[in-house]
Design a protein with these regions (language model features):
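N-terminal pre-ligand scaffold of iron-sulfur
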Residues: 1-55, 70-71, 87-103
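Short cysteine/histidine-rich metal-coordination sites, predominantly Zn2+-binding motifs
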Residues: 59-66, 76-84
Length: 103
């Protein structure tokens, strides 16, 4: 399992996010805090590879086709026939830093 140090935990405020490219994972990730819980997912839409962003109206969305994804589980919310979820990344907080893992 590959482990990467990403940022200090205090860099992310509640209802805020940031994105970063992780070369070792060949993926852009989005890290966000919602209801004081950290989430880490792929920031690349599984539909056609469009950019994913965070909307503090309780979903993630793709700019290209308007797909909305659940913050908690990454499932598509507005196209029930679209079954592919956003990829999750495991993470841990250690000595005030967020580390993510590739499964």
């Amino acid at each position: 399992m590959v482990k990467k140090k990403i940022c200090k935990i205090d860099k992310i405020e509640n209802n805020d996010f940031f994105k970063v490219w992780i070369e070792d994972f060949k993926d852009e990730i989005i890290i966000y805090k919602y209801n004081n819980k950290i989430y880490v997912k792929s920031a690349i839409c599984p539909h056609f590879g469009g950019p994913i962003s965070y909307n503090n109206d309780k979903y993630l969305f793709c700019y290209w086709h308007g797909l909305k994804f659940s913050i908690e589980n990454g499932q598509c919310l507005n196209q029930k026939s679209f079954k592919t979820c956003l990829s999750d990344y495991l993470y841990e907080v250690k000595k005030d830093y967020i580390y993510i893992f590739k499964k």
